[in-house]
């Protein structure tokens, strides 16, 4: 028993470091795609700003993890009813099963360059692992084991997260269309007149996002300031809008500098919020397991304080992953290409569903054109029609990058303020896709491939929950039934899976085409093995 506990604790801490590495590699798409896609700065500068945001967010994190993960499972089911003491082996099985499954799942998505939600994955893994432990350690069979899950909150979390996908896509498409309608593609001409308004709105959205999502739950802001921000969002937005709008007015003839500043601020802001709030998704299970073993009388229904040294170590690992992982580039490349301007080389092939949706869109567009006055259609086309692409054009322009960041930040802030469950990955990805549609960068020639790629990512999100819950169920079952040997089997399965994915996709340290470079990506199915046999003439992104 003691040997199994010791081995399990060591394994879960080691897996936490791997989980940080693969988690950042996948979530990097949240705060890198806009800056990289618009080439707002050099790659080193963008990475440095994102790394600074991550490091600052890690150091100022509150370090609290809700052990029961917002009511996913009933923690009292894993305590001794007579003494109230934690059943250590059961808790270790739950959290080790979660960590083992999470590492494999995130690395699988990273290998094929697909973004997924770490929030959905960890919630689903907690569901699967807790059911497995309850099944094998309590009487009553599967029916009784299922009662360990609090189905109402779990279904609410899933529903809220997937509804945010639709909201992010439609709102970003509408806002981008309106922004382009006002600014046109001749931004140097229109920005001096109305650019200060968009500057103020963008800065206000990002500042509010930093304050509310990034800092209100940290140690940096005094409680009274955090309370004021939560209670007075309109005042906070107004206080941010006025000076930002003034800066935009004073710099109205330097639109590139203003837009780049917004993009880089948004990049650092998303990095800060990610580390400050989502960091504990990766190290929380390890901290909770260590507390259950080492701290007498710990209550699973409470919050677990994370030591400062653990936060610092986690921040270092996250920054290292951001700089070193080529899989992070692969995931970012997927989103940048799907949202890029012009006939960009895509990773995905057409399929029947994408073709049917495109044909349906053609029919709807014909109806819209039939009821739209000709003069209005001509005027809208003159203001929103994209110009012919150039050879050195970035995947998307600076204005669209600011829309991506501002819409994502605003939606995340609103959801957080209203305590709505959401996924930053889903919102940032769908905001970028919606903005691309609203900016009219899709063409009928490549619409099916773009839509097939979006459907592939959406399909991956749908199966994330199933894969995460199933994987955690299997891992936790191995640990509960096998004891020390079960721990070895679970860790061995993770090692074999990681090695296998590295062999399939090539070394993680192998340099691939950077996002926006224009070089064609490797085939998404077996990216390295068939790459040489499928090479085509390089096409610059955005052409």
List each model region and its residues.
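Alpha-helical transmembrane segments and immediately membrane-proximal extracytoplasmic
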Residues: 2-420, 425-543
């Amino acid at each position: 028993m003691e040997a199994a506990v010791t081995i399990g604790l060591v394994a879960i801490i080691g897996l936490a470091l791997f989980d940080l590495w693969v988690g950042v590699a996948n979530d990097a798409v949240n705060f890198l795609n806009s800056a990289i896609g618009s080439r707002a700065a050099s790659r080193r500068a963008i990475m440095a700003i994102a790394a600074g945001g991550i490091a600052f967010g890690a150091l100022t994190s509150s370090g609290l993890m809700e052990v029961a993960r917002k009511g996913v499972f009933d923690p009292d089911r894993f305590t001794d009813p007579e003494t109230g003491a934690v059943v250590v082996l059961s808790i270790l099985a739950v959290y080790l099963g979660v960590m083992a499954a999470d590492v494999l799942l995130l690395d699988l998505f990273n290998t094929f360059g697909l973004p997924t939600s770490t929030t959905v994955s960890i919630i689903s893994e907690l569901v699967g692992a807790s059911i497995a432990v309850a099944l094998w350690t309590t009487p009553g069979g599967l029916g009784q084991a299922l009662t360990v899950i609090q189905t109402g909150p779990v279904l609410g979390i899933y529903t809220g997260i997937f509804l945010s996908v639709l909201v992010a896509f439609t709102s970003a498409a509408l806002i981008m269309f309106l922004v382009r309608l006002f600014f046109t593609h001749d931004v140097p001409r229109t920005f001096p007149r109305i650019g200060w308004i968009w500057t103020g709105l963008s800065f206000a959205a990002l500042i509010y996002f930093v304050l509310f999502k990034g800092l209100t739950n940290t140690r940096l802001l005094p409680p009274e300031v955090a309370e004021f921000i939560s209670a007075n969002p309109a005042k906070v937005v107004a206080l941010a809008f006025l000076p930002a709008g003034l800066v935009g007015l004073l710099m109205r003839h330097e639109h590139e500098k203003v837009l780049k500043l917004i993009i880089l601020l948004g990049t650092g802001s998303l990095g800060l919020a990610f580390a400050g709030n989502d960091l504990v998704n990766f190290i929380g299970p390890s901290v909770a397991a260590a507390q259950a073993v080492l701290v007498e009388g710990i209550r699973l229904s409470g919050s677990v304080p994370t030591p400062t040294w653990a936060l610092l170590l986690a921040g270092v690992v996250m920054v290292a992953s951001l700089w070193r992982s080529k899989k992070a580039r692969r995931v970012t490349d997927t989103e940048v290409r799907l949202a890029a301007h012009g006939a960009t080389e895509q990773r995905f092939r057409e399929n029947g569903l994408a073709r049917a949706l495109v044909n349906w869109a053609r029919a709807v567009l014909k109806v819209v054109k039939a009821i739209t006055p000709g003069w209005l259609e001509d005027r809208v086309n003159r203001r929103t029609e994209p110009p012919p692409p150039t050879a050195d054009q970035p995947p998307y322009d600076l204005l669209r990058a600011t829309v991506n960041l501002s819409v994502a930040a605003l939606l995340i802030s609103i959801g957080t303020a209203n305590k709505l469950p959401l996924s930053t990955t889903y919102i940032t990805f769908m905001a970028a896709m919606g903005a691309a549609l609203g900016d009219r960068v899709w063409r009928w020639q490549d619409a099916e491939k773009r839509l097939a790629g979006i459907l592939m990512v959406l399909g991956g999100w749908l199966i994330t929950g199933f894969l995460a819950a199933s994987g955690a169920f299997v891992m936790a079952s191995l640990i509960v039934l096998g004891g020390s040997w079960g721990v070895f089997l679970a860790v061995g399965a993770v090692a074999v899976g990681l090695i296998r994915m590295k062999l399939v996709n090539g070394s993680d340290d192998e340099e691939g085409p950077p996002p926006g470079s224009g070089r064609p990506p490797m085939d998404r199915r077996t990216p390295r093995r068939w790459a040489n046999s499928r090479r085509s003439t390089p096409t610059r992104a955005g052409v």
